[in-house]
Structure formats: C-alpha cells, structure tokens
Regions:
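A short alpha-helical cap/connector motif
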Residues: 1-116, 123-145, 149-193
C-alpha cells in the first residue's frame, strides 16, 4: 500500500472515531509507537483496546514490515468489525488477530511473549490488572505505551503510582494529546518486588 493510500485510511479512521465518540491514539503517539515497533524489531505486539483500529493499523503495518504478528483485544465487537474492515482494505488483516474479549482474560491466555504493547482501554480500572497480568509474558526490554494518562490522571493514579514504584520499569511520560506513559520492561533491575 502506498503511503498516500495508508494516510487516507488513517485519516478516515480518525474521522470515524471522533464521529463515534471514541477518540483514537494521538497521531504523534501512533507514529512513535510505529517507529518503536520497527526499530526494536518487535515480533509479537499486543493492543489492549482496539477501538476502531487507528492504532491497530499503525501496529499492523510495523508487524508486517517486521514479519511479526499483532493481537488486538477489545470487548466491543462492533468497533472490532470497523477495524477489521480497515485492516482488510490496507491488506494487513493477515498479520492481526482480533479478539473480542476482556483485556485481562485475553492477556492470561497469550501463547507468545510480548515485545511491544499498547494499553488504550475504555475501562481505565482495567489498566493496572492488565499490566500485572502482562508482566510474566513480557520479553526483556519490551516497550509498553499506555494512553490517556494525563486526560484521565485521576482514574489512572493507582496505575501510575504502581509503575513508579516498580523498579523493573523505566518510565517516561509523553505530552501528545491526552498523554501517554512509555515504559520499558527491565526484569533484571535490582530492587524488584
């Protein structure tokens, strides 16, 4: 797919998301996530919160270039069908498994270790249990982006406090739109709990 055609699909997805009250990942955060997937050579990516598929399309493109696979999880089957349609139009459906499931339940059944993850769930209370369930499935130096940490700071306070207290995570916060936490999993770091 040409970069122009891909951009047209991404623009259409963003418009669809805003019309339907489900703002997607900020474009700059999506581009950074795509770049991180490519530069780390991620093979197994996980998206918790498919939404309408905007970030899914970015991640799927990186997985296609890396020869990897993406699992994208959402409880909303209607939104996943929108994502499926756009992924098919982009020719990327073959690198994505869409799962209509609870985030924690889906994480607990993963077969492959995770190199890269995006947490962008509508249910902010599910961020921390999802991340905790993900820990034993993360490869060393796995990268995780969690969206909405500034716009939903109060709802995600326990999530962020837990990360800050966990010495096996390196954390930086990004300023794009609603804010993102960018984490790197360092399991051999001293002071683990």
């Amino acid at each position: 797919m040409s970069s122009v055609a891909r951009q047209e699909l991404l623009d259409a997805l963003r418009q669809h998301a805003h019309r339907n009250g489900a703002p997607p990942l900020h474009p700059d955060a999506a581009r950074l996530l795509h770049w991180l997937a490519l530069t780390t050579g991620a093979q197994h990516a996980l998206e918790l919160g498919t939404g309408n598929g905007y970030a899914t399309l970015w991640l799927a493109d990186a997985m296609a270039q890396n020869g990897g696979q993406l699992i994208s999880v959402d409880r909303d089957a209607v939104r996943q069908e929108v994502a499926r349609d756009y992924l098919a139009r982009a020719g990327l459906l073959d690198v994505v498994t869409l799962r209509c499931d609870d985030a924690v339940a889906a994480v607990e059944t993963l077969d492959s270790p995770v190199d890269l993850a995006l947490i962008d769930l509508g249910d902010k209370e599910a961020y921390l249990p999802s991340l905790r369930a993900l820990l034993p499935r993360l490869r060393p130096h796995a990268v995780i982006m969690a969206d909405n940490v500034r716009s939903h700071a109060q709802e995600l306070a326990a999530f962020l406090d837990w990360i800050r207290a966990e010495p096996r995570f390196a954390l930086t916060e990004l300023p794009f739109g609603p804010g993102q936490a960018l984490l790197c999993w360092l399991p051999d770091r001293a002071g683990t709990r």
